[in-house]
């Protein structure tokens, strides 16, 4: 190592952003800095004092990602038709306003805050507040239209969430409304209770156009669920949901893991193995390190906090090095692919222009013998992205023929005939269906670390691409909605529990 390289290695990372005081929610300056191989944050409120937290658990990985993917090339352009004006400034004017730098890639609509469970970690406050938020059928249709009217990208991926969305009997009709409005990908975020018990209702969701089931799945030990969900009978229910999915012909399930230190951080390897064993129906594992919103108590934060690189290291250990920390890329890695495909196909593709520290992902390819390897062993993913940047720059310079010729450089980078064939289909057709065929032959593992008031970073939130549509005609970034806006928005459209029970004559947990 040269003296110059050594000096670069010794440089400690430091930058500044804006955060929130966890007590009063006023904006405060935030310092992000490196110490002992970890990236920390610190912020001070004039009234409530100093707060510190872990920002990113691996400084080496952080600096690599920051250098490669935190730059202007990966910035979005926001909405051409913003829904609100700037009055108080970000994050109080959501949304989306002109300060937001990305458009909606995944829209979320909470169809109820009622639930048939009472999970202590739920950020949607299901069953914990004394009101019922349940938008009307027409309000939900209007929210779908709101997302579809976004420009330059009409949101075509939608999640129905809650609460527990499956306790609405009209959910199949709402899915059909989304498909009618032109949404290509519709997923349902669920604990699976009703789908394990009522296969006919499950099939109605599929027949209506549901693309994917977003299944709460914290592990394969009942002790986990006692801590995270307050029940000890859920493992068999998860198995039953997969069994019913096979019976009705659904082959796209995402296992959604709420990850907490000391609870299920030793279970990631077994969850990956379970996904591999069930890869005929499991398409993805989405790991969500716990955020301190909802009913997760403040005094539990320190012992339960776990960051994206902590999760990556645990997976490396628990897969015996099959998936290393260098097999992951930040969630904005696909930007050049969207841009390159756009100039070649002369159409707009969704751009994942979120902040690179919001999450990370990798893909694993399952072999016939049940073994698996990360896609980085089959494809030079960084060269792949570099070629797509070259394709994009050729296209925007008007050299469309050259851009198309550069596409020929992509497939020789792929070692596996299976993966090469799948990618060829995606590259040549550039369709949602081709991408779906690719996703059905691999398993994605994603880690999304949603923010709370303790680790809130304005720089991150302004680049968010996962947005809630709400009945007031606004679209709000995920982390501002759950940290700041949820209660006030829901209360505008809520009725009291007593009013609801008098109107319907049922328990809050019962389907209506």
What are these regions (language model features)?
Residues 1-87, 93-95, 346-512:
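Radical SAM enzyme core and accessory elements
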Residues 37-62, 66-190, 194-200, 204, ...:
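Conserved alpha-helical substructure of the radical SAM core
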Residues 40, 106, 212, 254, ...:
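Broad gene-expression machinery/nucleic-acid interaction feature
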Residues 109-111, 123-126, 162, 190, ...:
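Glycine-rich, histidine-containing beta strand-loop boundary motifs that form or position
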Residues 125-130, 220-223, 292-293:
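A short, flexible beta-alpha/helix-coil linker loop
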Residues 126-134, 227-233, 300-301:
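Short glycine-enriched, charge-decorated loop/helix-capping segments at active-site entrances
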Residues 141-159, 168-289:
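Radical SAM/AdoMet-radical enzyme domain recognition
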Residues 247-433, 437:
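Radical SAM enzyme [4Fe-4S]-AdoMet core and its adjacent flexible, acidic
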């Amino acid at each position: 190592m040269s003296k110059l390289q050594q000096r670069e290695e010794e440089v400690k990372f430091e930058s500044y952003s804006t955060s929130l005081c966890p007590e009063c929610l006023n904006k405060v300056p935030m310092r992000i800095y490196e110490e002992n191989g970890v990236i920390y944050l610190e912020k001070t409120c004039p009234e409530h004092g100093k707060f510190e937290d872990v920002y990113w658990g691996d400084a080496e990985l952080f600096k690599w990602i920051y250098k490669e993917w935190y730059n202007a090339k990966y910035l979005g352009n926001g909405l051409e038709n913003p829904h609100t004006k700037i009055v108080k400034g970000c994050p109080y004017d959501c949304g989306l306003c002109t300060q937001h730098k990305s458009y909606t890639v995944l829209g979320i609509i909470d169809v109820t805050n009622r639930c048939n469970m009472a999970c202590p970690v739920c950020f949607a406050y299901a069953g914990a507040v004394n009101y019922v938020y349940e938008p009307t059928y027409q309000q939900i249709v209007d929210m779908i239209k709101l997302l579809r009217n976004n420009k330059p990208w009409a949101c075509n991926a939608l999640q129905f969430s809650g609460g527990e969305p499956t306790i609405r009997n009209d959910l199949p009709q709402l899915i059909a409304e989304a498909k009618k409005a032109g949404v290509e990908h519709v997923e349902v975020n669920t604990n699976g209770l009703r789908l394990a018990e009522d296969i006919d209702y499950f099939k109605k969701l599929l027949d209506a156009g549901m693309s994917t089931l977003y299944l709460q799945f914290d592990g394969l030990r009942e002790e986990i669920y006692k801590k995270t969900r307050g029940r000890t009978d859920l493992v068999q229910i998860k198995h039953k949901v997969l069994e019913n999915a096979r019976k009705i012909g659904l082959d796209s399930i995402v296992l959604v893991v709420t990850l907490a230190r000391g609870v299920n951080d030793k279970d990631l390897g077994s969850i990956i193995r379970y996904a591999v064993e069930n890869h005929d129906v499991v398409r993805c594992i989405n790991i969500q390190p716990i955020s301190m919103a909802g009913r997760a108590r403040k005094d539990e934060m320190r012992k339960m906090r776990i960051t994206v690189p902590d999760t990556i290291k645990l997976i490396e250990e628990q897969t015996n090095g099959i998936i290393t920390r260098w097999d992951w890329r930040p969630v904005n890695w696909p930007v050049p692919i969207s841009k390159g495909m756009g100039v070649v196909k002369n159409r707009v593709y969704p751009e994942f222009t979120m902040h690179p520290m919001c999450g990370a992902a990798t893909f694993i390819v399952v072999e016939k013998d049940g073994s698996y390897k990360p896609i980085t062993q089959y494809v030079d993913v960084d060269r792949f992205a570099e070629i797509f940047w070259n394709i994009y720059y050729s296209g925007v310079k008007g050299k469309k023929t050259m851009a198309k010729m550069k596409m020929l450089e992509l497939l020789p980078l792929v070692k596996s005939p299976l993966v090469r064939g799948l990618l060829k289909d995606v590259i040549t057709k550039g369709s949602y269906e081709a991408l779906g065929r690719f996703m059905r032959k691999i398993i994605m593992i994603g880690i999304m670390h949603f923010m709370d008031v303790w680790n809130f970073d304005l720089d991150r939130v302004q680049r968010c691409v996962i947005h809630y549509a709400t009945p007031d005609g606004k679209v709000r970034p995920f982390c501002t909605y759950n940290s700041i806006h949820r209660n006030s928005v829901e209360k505008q459209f809520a009725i009291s529990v007593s009013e609801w029970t008098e109107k319907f004559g049922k328990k809050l947990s019962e389907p209506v």
